[in-house]
Amino acid sequence: MLKFIKNIFKDSNTRELEKLQHIVDEINSLEPYMKKLSDEQLRDKTREFKERIVKGETLDELLPEAFAVVREAAQRSTSEKFRHYDVQLMGGIVLHQGKIAEMKTGEGKTLAATLPVYLNALTGKGVHVVTVNDYLAKRDSEWMGQIYRFLGLSVGVILNGMTPRERKKAYQADVTYGSNNEFGFDYLRDNLAYNPDDVVQGELHYAILDEVDSILIDEARTPLIISGPAQETTKDYRKFNRIIPRLVKGRDYEVDEKNRTVHLTEEGLARVEKKLNISNLYDDQNFQLAHQLNQALKAHTLMKKDRDYIVKDGEVKIVDEFTGRIMEGRRFSEGLHQAIEAKEGVAVNKESQTFASITYQNFFRMYDKLAGMTGTAATEEEEFIKIYGMEVVQIPTNKPMIREDLPDVVFRTEEAKFKAVAEEVALKYKKGQPVLVGTVDIEKSEKLSRMLKRKGIPHQVLNAKNHEKEAEIIKKAGQKNSVTISTNMAGRGTDIVLGEGVKELGGLHVIGTERHESRRIDNQLRGRSGRQGDPGSSQFFVSLEDDLLRLFGSDNISMLMDRMGFDDDQPIEHKMITRSLERAQKKVEGRNFEIRKTILEYDNIMNKQREIIYEQRKKILFASDLKEYIMGMIEMLVDDIMDTYLSSEVHPDDWDIDGLIKYLSEFNLVNINEEDFKDKDREKIREELIKIATKTYEEKEAEIGKESMQKLIKNLALRIIDRNWMNHLDNMDELRQGIGLRAYGQRDPLTEYKFESYDMFNGMTGTIREEIIKNLFRIEVKEREINLDPIMLKRLKYRRNFLSNRANRPQKKAKRQPIVKPDKPGRNDPCPCGSGKKYKHCCGR
């Protein structure tokens, strides 16, 4: 009875671990048998497993035996003689189940992943192991590749700079390693290809994401973008860079730090309009100027040097707020980067046009099965379940965790806090205990460094400015008397090994100088200490002037301190303070989750359209005969034409035959005249139009030959689809920027976005049909050899578009108006664009 009651009160994670333990016991029971096998017999198990899968055995049924094979192979094939611990077996099972395994630092996530990778690779569909950078992809493919190759599986790696041929070969391997960037960009590049041989990626079957929280949460708002140079607008950014410093905060503009937004006041707007010599900044013709002004305001008021970005070698480089690293090759979106370049006095690059884009959220959800591993995921489990359908299972450590996490120490001012941190570091240094101090940005790390220099304490500083020394600095961080000051760079993916005699001193002591918005980032910093059962300790020093408490904390804290009469230098330890910190972090985490969820809701609409376009493109690219495709397109176009000029809703006497003849003349159709449509009903006219178009197609094909015709159609169709899709992406961006203001009119912005984007998409697909048929019929063939150059991908600029959660959030009080359209005509009125069509069949589609 007591056991039954205990089972009721067990948490879900404990119950899950008990289920996993049964499978682990089964794997362990097979170990003696596996040890008796020769290398050849062990390797032959791969062939045997594949045959059993063909006969109908499931991967779940194979799992215990396959995992036992991998464990034995690891001991025989690696120089380290790796043997998977039971907790690593548990992690491997969780990954196979398409869940997230939370495994603490130093617990061997990389080795644990070899188990489900091998098992799932047996299907022959390929497995992708996704890391956060090229270095880890290359290292892990070589390191863990020893195990796979020993068992007869092929291993590939995708790295930046590889040729399409090299990439294709890597994807054809049983196991493919690569960074999240490379996998995402290959998907986009494949959907810009003009030759089937240039498509490299293949099917998306099963992926394991290392540091899954970094990829799916921290970078969820960071779309992958392939872009090219657009119009020249750099002079306007320089113009605003001269105007904004003359504006006064509070009088001319207001800044909302909590929501990271800025907007002009009425007085500021009048001042700017006077300097620009325009009457209304928010007129339609000044839309671009208004947008650039807004970005320039953000650059000057919200974006901070040495926190959000650094200037290095005459370039503005983004600093990742979660990792503290430089984000090479990435640029802030929507002109913000250009505004910062103007602010910092470096060369202002041209803005760009988007050719293709996708978010990590939608890219990785395309996999049949997705799993992930990280040291910090439990705090974000709700998001993983709701967005990705992935549960989080917390895997116990192989050895008990003995790190001591001390209570936070709170000060009234930032100055007092850093003074106390410096004194704490001095005490630890005198004792000989190594210390790692985490700061939130470069500026704070340099401030603390100056304080330690004044105390005569030797130390190392690790931040985005000297990231090339990272390996050397981290290598020494666990030695006696070592003091390391680091931004979040040391918070993830680093393994600090303790030097001789350090365990006796208490291990590595970690000091956090500020609470991050996310508890995960704090936990990552703590996790640098106490790895694999080592001793260690951690403590956070915070102040009421820190951004988290200042912007999201309760005002009651300051009132409490005033009543209790605390001095600035006096540390505070109070349950109310601790609770307030926790509430503030949870509040911000929930808020950021809602932002990511909203972005995904909008992106899902775009994603459906992307899937339709890319599927159409894929069919064209791989088709051997496109005549049927063109015939289907002709029928759809004829239906559009009939609805426009010969509507069934009007009497035949009112049909616009003249307009029809004029429109058809643009297509170079053969033998067409007004007599063809006299005294005929709609169906007869429809049949006649299809017949004429078909005859035109056949004559064109006879003139240039079937093979050349197929080549012509393929290149023409792909080029027209790409051009219209690019324009559509720009139009959707403009719609998205202005749609939030619909809320002021008591209309749901998301619903409005759905309807308008649907109309825009239908209009684009109709334009694609029209342009393909019109261009196909109008092309004059000078020679039998048709040579249409595709878009030159080499000229495209591959970059990451960084949507900063600090600078691209929707404005609370926006002054810029949404995209203004003229009074909307009736659906049956002539379209105001002058095409001669009805509005519903032209711009109203």
Swiss-Prot record:
ATP binds at residues 88, 106-110, 495. GO terms for molecular function: ATP binding; metal ion binding; protein-exporting ATPase activity. One of its GO terms (cellular component) is plasma membrane. It holds the Pfam family SecA_PP_bind. SUPFAM superfamilies: Helical scaffold and wing domains of SecA (SSF81886), P-loop containing nucleoside triphosphate hydrolases (SSF52540), Pre-protein crosslinking domain of SecA (SSF81767). It comes from the Bacteria. InterPro entries: Helicase_ATP-bd, Helicase_C-like, P-loop_NTPase, SEC_C_motif, SecA, SecA_CS, SecA_DEAD, SecA_motor_DEAD. One of its GO terms (biological process) is protein targeting. Residues 809-818 have a biased composition (Basic residues). It catalyses: ATP + H2O + cellular proteinSide 1 = ADP + phosphate + cellular proteinSide 2. Its cofactor is Zn(2+). SMART domains: SecA_DEAD (SM00957), SecA_PP_bind (SM00958). Residues 804-838 are annotated as: Disordered. It is found in: Cell inner membrane; Cytoplasm. It is a peripheral membrane protein. May bind 1 zinc ion per subunit. Zn(2+) binds at residues 831, 833, 842-843. Keywords: ATP-binding, Cell inner membrane, Cell membrane, Cytoplasm, Membrane, Metal-binding, Nucleotide-binding, Protein transport, Translocase, Translocation, Transport, Zinc. Gene3D superfamilies: Helical scaffold and wing domains of SecA, P-loop containing nucleotide triphosphate hydrolases, SecA, preprotein cross-linking domain. Its EC number is 7.4.2.8. HAMAP family: SecA. Monomer and homodimer. Part of the essential Sec protein translocation apparatus which comprises SecA, SecYEG and auxiliary proteins SecDF. Other proteins may also be involved. Belongs to the SecA family. Part of the Sec protein translocase complex. Interacts with the SecYEG preprotein conducting channel. Has a central role in coupling the hydrolysis of ATP to the transfer of proteins into and across the cell membrane, serving as an ATP-driven molecular motor driving the stepwise translocation of polypeptide chains across the membrane. This is Protein translocase subunit SecA. It comes from Halothermothrix orenii (strain H 168 / OCM 544 / DSM 9562). The gene is secA.
